[in-house]
Regions:
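Residues that flank catalytic or metal-binding motifs in active/ligand-binding sites
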Residues: 18, 71, 84, 168-170
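Short, solvent-exposed loop/turn segments at secondary-structure junctions
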Residues: 27, 80-82, 95-96, 153-155, ...
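A short hydrophobic beta-strand segment most commonly corresponding to one strand
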Residues: 73-76, 165-182
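Alpha-helical transmembrane segments of integral membrane proteins
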Residues: 130, 147-150, 180
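Short beta-strand His + acidic residue motifs that chelate non-heme Fe in jelly-roll/DSBH
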Residues: 137, 154-163
Length: 187
């Protein structure tokens, strides 16, 4: 498996959990979007967040001897992109502890932007490397390629740019937890 080679560890689809799944934005094949629908694709398609889906399966992870919940694997295989591309916003300088991750993920995006710009939070060393003027990094996706990261990286699906009526964004998404020396992937 290519993922195993890339990661350097065995990768197993965990049959007891949902298999990696699809994010599909845009119209069905042969259908076009109107201006309002195109406008929606040009807006943030998801919240600013860290991936904590593994928390829904805490009882599942208990069956393994060695489990590392601090280093969650997240991956996206790009299948189809809008005409003008697509990608992922990344706030790689936001190094949150577990309590901050738990709080941050359940806030409204407006509150998250305030958190990301909260000078007091960063000045008290709760997060390293903060620059309040810095925009998030943009990781551009390419059709047929996979992007992955390990850890609680703050990120968001980047909205489409100059959306066209037949644009679609289709990706295969998944997550993984290292259990007994193998990545167990799920959705």
């Amino acid at each position: 498996m290519k993922m195993s080679k890339e990661l350097g560890d065995l990768v197993i689809c965990d049959d007891d959990l949902a298999l990696p799944g699809f994010h599909i934005f845009g119209p069905k094949q042969g259908v076009t979007m109107n201006k309002t629908e195109c406008y929606y694709l040009e807006q943030p398609l998801a919240s600013i967040h860290t991936d904590i889906q593994y928390k829904e399966h805490l009882s599942h992870w208990k069956q393994f001897k060695e489990v590392d919940l601090s280093q969650v694997l997240s991956f996206t295989l790009t299948i189809k992109l809008p005409t003008h591309g697509g990608g992922l916003y990344i706030w790689d300088w936001a190094d949150f502890d577990q309590e901050m991750i738990d709080t941050f993920n359940f806030q409204h995006n407006d509150e998250k932007v305030d958190v990301l710009k909260n000078k007091y939070l960063w000045d008290n060393d709760s997060v390293n490397g903060y620059n309040p003027q810095e925009e998030p990094l943009y990781e551009e996706y390419m059709e047929g390629n996979m992007v992955y990261f390990i850890g609680h990286l703050v990120h968001q699906i980047a909205p489409a740019k100059k959306c066209l009526p037949n644009d679609r964004r289709i990706t295969l998404q998944g997550h993984g937890i290292m259990c007994d020396g193998a990545w167990r992937v799920y959705f």
